[in-house]
Amino acid sequence: MKAGSIASSPGKLKIMNLLAKKELDAGRIAKSTRIPLNIVKWLLDELEKDGLVEQEAGSYKATEEGIKALKALKM
């Protein structure tokens, strides 16, 4: 499971917690998490490569696999 990818970075964890609730664009994620936009974009690319988030029309959302990985961390 990819929970280790999320657990390896506090920024990834913040982003996944947001995206598990709703779809957001990178700018809104940066504002909500207070993480610089360039770092948010880099983290989103990493999460997307791992199959934990997906982008559609400029917005990001957690995938089913991403939600499962996030739940595994909370157990």
From Swiss-Prot:
InterPro entries: ArnR1-like_HTH, WH-like_DNA-bd_sf, WH_DNA-bd_sf. This is Uncharacterized protein AF_1808. It comes from Archaeoglobus fulgidus (strain ATCC 49558 / DSM 4304 / JCM 9628 / NBRC 100126 / VC-16).
